[in-house]
């Protein structure tokens, strides 16, 4: 679907995304890694660089993954002026399509992995957050997936794994909602 809801706002809020596999799928580690590269926290994410830093089109931009037992979603959100919504969608679509069309270099993949693993290590310093994460792991998988277990799987992600995920979130599969 592609829907715009006009609420006479000063800013446009756009969500693009697609449906994916569930949380027990082994491709989830590649998905989380690629998502972090595309729109994760920090100034270096792909969409932040392209939409905010280079062009100044958005106030905020991020992408997210939500995996349930039987399915999941990948989404990207941005807040922008009304007049830049279509430009932002085209740029985001071009960036994702580029990821789906060719493998990232090994050097780029290593940088992406280091950043993601570093973010996990920083997050592990927050004991409450780690306890919640381990509790969810136990509830979902009947075992605890600690940071070492996750790091091992992130390090095993290949260029073709990332490209396969990019193909799954290709713009041709997107739905879009804009509220302005």
Locations of regions flagged by a protein language model:
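Short beta-strand/turn micro-motifs at beta-sheet edges
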Residues: 1-5, 60-66
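M16/insulysin-pitrilysin zinc metalloprotease superfamily fold
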Residues: 41, 62, 66-123, 145
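C-terminal regions of mature proteins
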Residues: 113, 117-180
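Short beta-strand-to-loop capping motifs
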Residues: 18-20, 78-80, 180
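Buried hydrophobic packing residues in well-ordered domains
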Residues: 16, 32-34, 51, 76, ...
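M16/MPP (pitrilysin/insulinase) zinc-metallopeptidase core fold and M16-derived inactive scaffolds
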Residues: 41-57, 68
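His/Glu-based metal-binding/catalytic segments typifying zinc-dependent metallopeptidases
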Residues: 1-45
